[in-house]
């Protein structure tokens, strides 16, 4: 299972009964925003070749949209393609880690354990278990080696395995680093955490989550994919070798995904979970603060990770997020915690970044973020070039010379037919040559452009170049 800090992920949603189907259909999002989200999802699927995506959106703290795109099952010589629906389930992979962290925090709230307890208090015999804390395993700062860093299912993972066998193998190896001194993504950490939940409660991990979280939130579609494959009414997982044809992905052996990536559900139900994160309805406020606070290393360096969640800054807005990938499925869940917005995306092909791309393009649109001054200037110049004009008062001499009548005409003839982009967002900034460098993504349904600019301290532009995105 790849590191969700570096993977980009997609997955779709599935249901099992007409009653559930009716309950999962949601569409109260503003039509203009809905159209932009639909266009983004369709474009990303077209560009990546991912068969399907299921998307659910929370706005103002409430689920307002659930929709699926593409084919949940591809056509074969004997059967037609099956369209994806919002009622279909997909494996959510490492997004499951949020639920494991929540289980630990629930137990801390009732005094059953503490985040700063050594894990050896509950699971004797692990490497330096008297030093490594529960907080460190939930934040990937323990030093325990990842049992699945590969981006494919090895033959050794096809037979069944138990959590205890994983712990006995990887939890008793020498640590990769001193506890608390580095951040390194490791699924082993969350297998250990799940085992602690079972030890403390005396109940199976999935049963505890069902009783304390899923039933409370009305998440009726949740499936334990670590113990049974998804059904025929759920999305089919796919993978490919190099750029070859899509093939049905092999399933990991039972037991391998315990507590680290075992859950499957609809995007609709993942969005119900996001509602609870925004409303802080499952845990006490102090527990959410611990979960959402970036864990710092012993040297004071940040990790961009809390407890089972990534902690990011998106253009000045706090984002609590995580991706997930298991064989044939990729997902992404982004929650703009102070804006009441969440975007959950599930896809049914592994090793592709469609889910993250959809989530990160859609989230600021749903939140209604206004363009920054730098973005607005870039957009205004872009619109002017589409009409065959350029405001030379904004340009330094070199750039003014660059925009010859021929150059302006080429910009107009190539950009005007594209119309209004879906998104126009700054993606990077840096200092170079006494100027500020900025790059922007310009996204269309069937085209992705990159704009690069250089700006002097006095605000004059030295560069404004557009090219196809690599």
Model-derived features: positions:
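Short, well-ordered beta-strand elements
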Residues: 321-322, 332-349, 451-452, 461-467
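Exposed beta-sheet edge and beta->alpha loop/turn motif
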Residues: 429-470
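Short solvent-exposed beta->alpha transition segments
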Residues: 389-433
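Short, gly/Ser/Thr-rich active-site loops of penicillin-recognizing serine hydrolases
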Residues: 345-407, 469
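Short, conserved catalytic-motif segment at the N-terminal edge
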Residues: 28-90, 112-117, 172
């Amino acid at each position: 299972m790849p590191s969700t800090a570096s993977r980009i992920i997609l997955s779709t949603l599935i249901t099992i009964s007409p009653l559930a189907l009716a309950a999962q259909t949601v569409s109260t999002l503003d039509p203009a925003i809905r159209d932009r989200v639909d266009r983004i999802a369709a474009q990303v699927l077209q560009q990546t070749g991912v068969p399907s995506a299921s998307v659910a959106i929370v706005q103002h703290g409430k689920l307002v949209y659930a929709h699926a795109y593409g084919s949940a099952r591809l056509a074969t010589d004997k059967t037609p393609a099956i369209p994806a629906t919002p009622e279909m389930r997909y494996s959510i992979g490492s997004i499951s880690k949020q639920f494991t962290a929540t289980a630990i925090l629930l137990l801390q709230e009732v005094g059953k354990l503490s985040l700063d307890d050594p894990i050896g208090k509950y699971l004797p015999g692990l490497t330096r278990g008297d030093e490594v804390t529960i907080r460190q395993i939930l934040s990937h700062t323990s030093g325990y080696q990842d049992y699945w860093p590969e981006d494919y299912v090895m033959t050794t993972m096809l037979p069944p395995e138990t959590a205890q066998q994983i712990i006995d193998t990887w939890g008793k190896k020498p640590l990769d680093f001193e506890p608390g001194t580095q951040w390194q993504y490791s699924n082993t950490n969350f297998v250990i955490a799940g085992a602690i939940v079972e030890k403390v409660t005396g109940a199976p991990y999935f049963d505890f989550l069902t009783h304390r979280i899923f039933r409370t939130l009305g998440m009726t579609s949740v499936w334990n994919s670590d113990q049974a494959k998804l059904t025929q009414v759920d999305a089919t997982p796919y993978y490919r070798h190099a750029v070859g044809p899509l093939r049905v992905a092999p399933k990991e052996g039972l037991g391998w995904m315990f507590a680290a990536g075992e859950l499957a559900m609809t995007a609709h139900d993942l969005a119900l979970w996001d509602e609870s994160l925004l409303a802080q309805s499952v845990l006490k406020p102090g527990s959410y603060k611990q979960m959402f606070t970036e864990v710092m290393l012993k040297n004071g360096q940040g990790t961009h990770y809390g407890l089972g969640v990534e902690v990011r800054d998106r253009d000045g807005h706090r984002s609590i997020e995580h991706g997930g990938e298991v064989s044939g499925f990729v997902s992404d869940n982004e929650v703009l915690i102070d804006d009441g917005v969440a975007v959950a995306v599930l896809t049914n092909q592994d090793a592709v970044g469609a889910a993250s791309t959809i989530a990160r393009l859609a989230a600021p649109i749903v939140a209604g973020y206004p363009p920054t001054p730098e973005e607005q200037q870039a957009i205004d110049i872009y619109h002017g070039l589409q009409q065959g004009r350029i405001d030379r008062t904004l340009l330094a001499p070199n750039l003014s010379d660059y925009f010859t009548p021929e150059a302006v005409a080429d910009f107009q003839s190539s950009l005007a037919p594209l119309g209004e982009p879906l998104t126009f967002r700054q993606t990077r900034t840096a200092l170079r040559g006494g100027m500020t460098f900025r790059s922007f993504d310009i996204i269309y349904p069937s085209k992705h452009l990159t704009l690069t600019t250089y700006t002097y301290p006095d605000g004059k532009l030295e560069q404004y170049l557009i090219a196809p995105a690599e």
